[in-house]
From Swiss-Prot:
It is an enzyme of class 1 (oxidoreductase). Fe cation 1 binds at residues 130, 161, 164. Fe cation 2 binds at residues 161, 224, 258, 261. Keywords: Deoxyribonucleotide synthesis, Iron, Metal-binding, Oxidoreductase. Pfam families: Ribonuc_red_sm (PF00268). This is Ribonucleoside-diphosphate reductase small chain. There is no sign of synthesis of a corresponding large subunit after fertilization. The authors suspect that the unfertilized oocytes contain a stockpile of large subunits ready for combination with newly made small subunits. Binds 2 iron ions per subunit. GO terms for molecular function: metal ion binding; ribonucleoside-diphosphate reductase activity, thioredoxin disulfide as acceptor. It comes from the Eukaryota. It comes from Spisula solidissima.
Length: 384
């Protein structure tokens, strides 16, 4: 009887223990310690989550940079102003073979030593710089911008920059007969510190992952609008003397192209939602101005061809102010154009197409609005 009662009490006790809730007071110390250690370990080492690439907030809301599944198809046109720029560039196509250099050598031989030095070094800078512009277009802008119309322009700009680089290389190859000097000029980024400084500044923007697309658009507008301006002016200065017709004609074509590229950069900038502050834009432009001024007044002084260095410095600031206005910013220097001969050089030009195909040079019919016009229709009405 006693054993039966004892067994019954043991069963009741074990049943009650099974129903008991474990609290902090009655929890065994060993179990409590294990749970606490587990909680600490899970707090220290959270579960790994998939790491997603960081996208800047500014890029998330930029229509030009937003993912565009229709970027592979041209029509329908969404950005008519950008498309118009592309067609304008397309109409301005030319090739290096169209520039006659046959008369240049006689003039080259008559130049002074310092004039040859200046021209050859300017050409060396130009030959290298177009490749740097293309590096930016291929590696950055063409990958970032998702708007079809803009990608069309960038694609065509790449082709034209290649032609510019070919043209400058042909000029060096034509004028410079010494193989060592020629090699020195072709490798100007490595052999000429003044060219390297300009190249390094441009390359810095290509490799800068912290700067926004808007900042880099401004920087490369400065490359094509400021870094080239003084050198273009110096070659136009030679045109006043009626010498080097091949050099000066190619300079007109290339300066017109670069003017269009700079205008396109400003157009792209106008479409951006998130723009840098005016102070930041002024900073970028001023850096480019100072580098260009040193290049043409100290490292490679334009007085070598008879130009005034102070006026060249002023001209570079004038060009920078003009670019700032295009970017809808205040002027930074408030300078007038000191070179009256540059006032008569329009990037679109006034020369008759059939006389010399210079400024108004464009492929026939490209700007007429496509193949819908009657001027391109095939008829049998003509008199033979």
């Amino acid at each position: 009887m006693l054993s039966i009662n004892t067994t019954r009490k043991e069963n009741e006790l074990s049943g009650n223990l099974g129903k008991m809730k474990i609290t902090e007071e009655n929890k065994p110390k060993k179990v409590l310690g294990e749970i606490t250690n587990f909680q600490r370990s899970t707090q220290k080492t959270p579960l790994k989550q998939e790491i997603k690439p960081v996208v800047k907030k500014s890029q998330q809301v930029e229509p030009l940079l937003a993912d565009n599944p229709r970027r592979f198809v041209v029509l329908p046109i969404q950005y008519h102003d950008i498309w118009k720029m592309y067609k304008k560039a397309e109409a301005s196509f030319w090739t290096a073979e169209e520039v006659d250099l046959s008369k240049d050598m006689a003039h080259w031989e008559s130049l002074k030593k310092e004039e040859k030095h200046f021209i050859s070094h300017v050409l060396a800078f130009f030959a290298a710089s177009d490749g740097i512009v293309n590096e930016n277009l291929v590696e950055r802008f063409s990958k970032e911008v998702q708007v079809t119309e803009a990608r069309c322009f960038y694609g065509f700009q790449i082709a034209m920059e290649n032609i510019h680089s070919e043209m400058y290389s042909l000029l060096i190859d034509t004028y410079i007969k010494d193989p060592q000097e020629r090699d020195f000029l072709f490798n100007a980024i490595e052999t000429m510190p003044c060219v390297k400084e300009k190249a390094d500044w441009a390359m810095r923007w290509i490799n800068d992952d912290s700067s926004s697309y808007a900042e880099r658009v401004v920087a490369f507008a400065a490359v094509e609008g400021i870094f080239f301006s003084g050198s273009f002016a110096s070659i136009f200065w030679l045109k006043k003397r009626g010498i080097m017709p091949g050099l000066t004609f190619s300079n007109e074509l290339i300066s017109r192209d670069e003017g269009l590229h700079c205008d396109f950069a400003c157009l792209m900038f106008s479409h951006l939602v998130n723009k840098p502050s005016q102070e930041r834009i002024h900073q970028i432009i001023d850096e480019a101005v100072k580098i260009e001024q040193v290049f043409l007044t100290e490292a490679l002084p334009c007085r070598l061809i008879g130009m005034n260095c102070d006026l060249m410095r002023q001209y570079i600031e004038f060009v920078a102010d003009r670019l700032l206005l295009e970017l809808k910013c205040d002027k930074l220097y408030n300078k007038e154009n000191p070179f009256d001969f540059m006032e008569h050089i329009s990037l679109e030009g006034k020369t008759n197409f059939f006389e010399k195909r210079v400024g108004e040079y464009q492929k026939m019919g490209v700007m007429s609005g496509g193949n819908t016009g009657d001027s391109h229709a095939f008829t049998l009405d003509a008199d033979f």
